């Protein structure tokens, strides 16, 4: 079971800012994933991602589909300066998160609740209020 504390520890090891109560889990839309060049290329085969929103940018960490643990080699940080827009589009049972940059657009399906991540639902509500 993934805990938000694990995301904090992961980002601290990489010297990336972490914002409490601002982590969610998203599922990638491979057909729209045009940003992936270089360091995140290995993450294309993965489906679930932990996403943390902070004042300095957005951290995206691949999750192992079997264990649910954070993957070291599947990491991308998009700095605040690179982000053109961030928006959540409400769908019937979920949201679609779109992060637009000059390099392309990242799109994730974000469910309202996530099994094994009890913190996800409350954090999603907090993030939706702040955007």
Where are each of the predicted segments found?
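Short amphipathic alpha-helical segments and helix-helix/interface helices
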Residues: 8, 124-125
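Surface-exposed beta-strand edges and flanking loops
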Residues: 20, 27, 53, 80, ...
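Canonical phosphoinositide-binding patch of PH/PH-like domains
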Residues: 103-122
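Generic structural motif
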Residues: 31-32, 56, 81, 91, ...
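A membrane-cytosol interface segment of integral membrane proteins
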Residues: 125-131
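Phosphoinositide-binding peripheral membrane targeting modules
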Residues: 39-50, 55-98
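Anionic N-terminal interaction surfaces
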Residues: 1-55
């Amino acid at each position: 079971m993934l805990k938000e504390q694990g995301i904090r520890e992961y980002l601290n090891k990489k010297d990336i800012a972490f914002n409490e109560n601002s982590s969610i889990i998203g599922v990638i839309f491979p057909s729209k994933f045009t940003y992936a060049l270089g360091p995140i290329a290995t993450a294309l085969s993965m489906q679930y991602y932990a996403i943390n929103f902070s004042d300095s940018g957005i951290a995206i960490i691949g999750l192992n589909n079997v264990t649910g643990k954070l993957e070291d080699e599947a990491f991308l940080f998009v700095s605040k300066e690179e982000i053109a827009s961030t928006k959540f589009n409400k769908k019937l049972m979920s949201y679609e998160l779109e992060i637009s940059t000059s390099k392309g657009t990242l799109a994730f399906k974000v469910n309202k609740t996530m099994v094994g991540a009890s913190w996800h639902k409350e954090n999603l509500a907090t993030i939706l209020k702040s955007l």
